[in-house]
């Protein structure tokens, strides 16, 4: 079964590196945006297994184009379409915090499951959910940890006084997964969010043993 990686222009550099590591060709997805904001998506090439690469920051703009690309890939003969989204959007809200709110995590999981046969992402924001599979509507979902790559990147340039700092309790598992292999101390702060862009961060004093 032939496989290829397909990428939008905004992720071309990262996608090219990934395609090289996987030993598959990389193809471009072209987007034309009309004056009213609609997007025309055109996929270059085809494959039986299509790996669609796009990080979903700026999700309201990118999600529709990703779904259109998935449809075009299937129309072009793809039997399997796998989404590779290094950043997976709308994962923060896993419960309604106030009456009338949508649970975005569940909605986006079902939406992606309707169009893709599998998903790969990096360190998704899963606070109260045990695994990514639980919200992905039955398709295989792989959450890759960035910790090994980060450990490798910083291991050769560490000061003996280095401390790994996390902003809040939710960050502790990520911080510890990097600090532990390097033998580093960990410091976790407390975060109080006062608005979308206003955050108060308190970091406790630290004394080495």
Which functions belong to the PLM regions below?
Residues 1-209:
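PRPP-associated nucleotide enzymes
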């Amino acid at each position: 079964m032939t496989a290829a990686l397909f990428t939008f222009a905004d992720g071309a550099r990262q996608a090219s590196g990934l395609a090289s590591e996987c030993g598959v060709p990389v193809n471009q997805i072209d987007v034309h945006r009309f004056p009213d904001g609609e997007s025309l998506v055109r996929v270059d090439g085809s494959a039986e297994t299509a790996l669609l690469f796009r990080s979903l920051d700026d999700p309201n703009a990118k999600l529709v184009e990703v779904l259109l690309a998935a449809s075009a890939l299937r129309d072009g003969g793809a039997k399997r379409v796998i989404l590779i989204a290094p950043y997976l959007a709308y994962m923060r809200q896993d419960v309604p915090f106030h009456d009338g709110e949508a649970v975005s995590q569940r909605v986006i999981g079902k939406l992606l499951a309707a169009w893709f046969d599998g998903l790969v992402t990096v360190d998704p924001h899963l606070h109260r959910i045990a695994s990514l599979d639980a919200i992905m509507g039955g398709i295989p979902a792989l959450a890759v940890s960035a910790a090994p790559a980060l450990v490798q990147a910083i291991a050769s340039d560490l000061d003996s006084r280095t401390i790994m700092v996390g902003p809040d309790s939710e960050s502790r598992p990520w911080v510890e997964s990097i600090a532990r292999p390097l033998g580093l101390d960990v410091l976790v702060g407390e975060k109080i969010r006062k608005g979308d862009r206003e955050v108060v961060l308190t970091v406790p004093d630290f004394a080495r043993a």
